[in-house]
């Protein structure tokens, strides 16, 4: 019984593997046909191992060993089928030398790492390069994107105003425009003179023809009358031309004088600005040392003018202002109350100024108040005067009303 089982192993196994190869080549399935030679070799390896094992069983002579070999053979076949096909890049020997543990594989035969590790390394290197590039751009900058910073920075708005640059430009443009206007006027005057000459020549020709036609009847009288008329017309035209020329000459002179004055004033203002750029140009220079307008010296001069009762005054403000005026000091504005007049003057000398519109308003109020100062006695006199005047007016109105009522009632009684 033992030799029957042993005679089957090596030769039949080889023939069986050959038969399987033929069947795999014939079969239309893509999985078997696409299988690499590596799979075939692994099958042959497994078959040879099973053959050796079968030889051992032949020597021992046990039927149970044959059944075990068959189960082992089936396992080896299933393992060889489970193995994935080798990648195209990996050589044949390294693929054969790789050991498989279920589905996990480790390429100890080859020096090349798996593609996932290579990709990670590449990404890391790219990231490092990008970081270094960004650091370099942060230090040096990118002129192709942002451009270089200006070598000569623009002047500060406080130190250099655009109005100063516009003034000389305006003067040059005005001069050029005036020259163009002169040229246009001269060309127009030439055209007019040409037209006049043509008209004169045509009139003369017409007159000549008329003279020839009317030569038979009163030629002498007509010619003398026409000559007189021509002379009168010529004299009138000459006078008109002289007047027109004199007007033009006067206009040109006035324009030239204006230009010269404007140029000189602009030059002077530029020179003054260069000498003292912080000087205030809006205010006219005052020879006196006092800041602000002078207070009225005589309070009695207000009798001639109608009194303004100072509706903007606060209680006690008029008396305080009167004291300032008596002392000959400047009256402080509403925003400056709490400071002495000397402190206000020192602040203004050092350059502290109110905003423009508020400054103008407060100055106007201050001027009005300075002209409206009156004492307590004057106030009482004004109040009594106002009351008397009011009573007189009321009495007049009542008397007129009584008369009207009396007339109406009297007329009714008579009827």
UniProtKB/Swiss-Prot annotation:
Record bears the keyword Nucleotide-binding: no
GO terms, biological process: granulocyte differentiation; hematopoietic stem cell proliferation; negative regulation of DNA-templated transcription; negative regulation of transcription by RNA polymerase II; Notch signaling pathway; positive regulation of alpha-beta T cell differentiation; somatic stem cell population maintenance; T cell differentiation in thymus
- Region entry Necessary for interaction with CIR1: which residue ranges? 179-272
Region annotation Necessary for interaction with HDAC3 and transcriptional repression: residue ranges? 273-415
Subcellular localization is given as: Nucleus
> Which residues are reported to carry the modification Phosphothreonine?
161
Regions crossing the membrane = none
In this chain, composition skew of type Low complexity spans 25-34, 93-110
Gene Ontology terms, MF aspect: chromatin binding; chromatin DNA binding; RNA binding
Q: Which family does it belong to?
A: Belongs to the NKAP family.
In its UniProt entry, what is this protein called? NF-kappa-B-activating protein
Tell me the organism.
Homo sapiens (Human)
